[in-house]
Every structure is written in C-alpha cells, then in structure tokens.
Design a protein with these regions (language model features):
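Hydrophobic helical h-region of N-terminal Sec-dependent signal peptides
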Residues: 9-17
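Lipid interaction determinants
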Residues: 24-78, 89-133
Length: 133
C-alpha cells in the first residue's frame, strides 16, 4: 500500500510539472514577428553565390523578401510570399517555383529570430535572422 501511495505521489508531481511548463503560443510568436524585417540566410542562391534574405512580415499574412547577393550586397530581386505560424512553426510560401520554407521551433530572443530551417520537409540547418531597425 505504501508503494502505491509513493507512485501515486510521484505521478501527481509529474502531472503538475508538465501542467506548469508551457510553450509560447502561436499568437505570441505572430505578434513578435509581424511588422518587422528579419535579415539572414534562408538558403537561396548557390554555394559560390549565396543570397541574403531580408523578409518583411506584414499583418495580412503576406510578406516581401528583399534579396541581395551576399558577397557584394547588390540587389538580387524581391520575392513576395505568404506566411503563417502553426504549432510553433513559421511557414514561408514563395509559390510553386520555390521550396516551402519552414522554421520549426521558431522563437524571438532579443533581436534574433531563431529556429530550424526545413525546405520541403527536409532539415537544412539551425538559423538566426537579425531584426533590422
């Protein structure tokens, strides 16, 4: 009987522990991302000619990616995209000509957007994008 009470107590403590831990919900993430421009590598371009992205996320679920060549800073073009956050993942949909980009476990820490980048469901790398003023 003592053994049952002991295990019941441990189970109760674990239940409370899980109940009090929380993840940032999608609305909080959405608010942190919206209306800002985030600059970094979203895996456009080629190894010998990489492109840096500056993504602006507007509150209507649309955005624009101001792309520049990483080596010389010359404009590479602007790409419109749709974006949304679902279950802690930021989705960037540039249309059929480009892979769907997912930033899983997305979080904003200070001036940095951080997470794991996936292209069409395949893990690429951990990334950090810096917020621009």
């Amino acid at each position: 009987m003592k053994m049952v009470k002991r295990y019941a107590g441990i189970l109760m403590m674990l239940t409370l522990l899980v109940g009090f831990t929380s993840c940032e919900d999608d609305e909080d993430i959405y608010d942190d991302l919206m209306g800002r421009t985030w600059v970094g590598d979203l895996w456009f371009g080629y190894d010998d000619n990489p492109i840096e992205s500056g993504i602006r996320l507007d509150n209507n679920g649309l955005g624009i990616d101001y792309q520049v060549y990483d080596y010389n800073g010359r404009p590479a073009g602007d790409l419109p995209f749709r974006w949304w956050v679902d279950y802690g993942t930021l989705y960037l949909d540039y249309g059929r000509d480009f892979e769907l980009r997912e930033i899983r476990g997305v979080r904003v820490r200070g001036r940095y957007l951080q997470g794991d980048l996936y292209l069409d469901g395949e893990y690429i790398d951990y990334i950090e994008l810096q917020m621009q003023q």
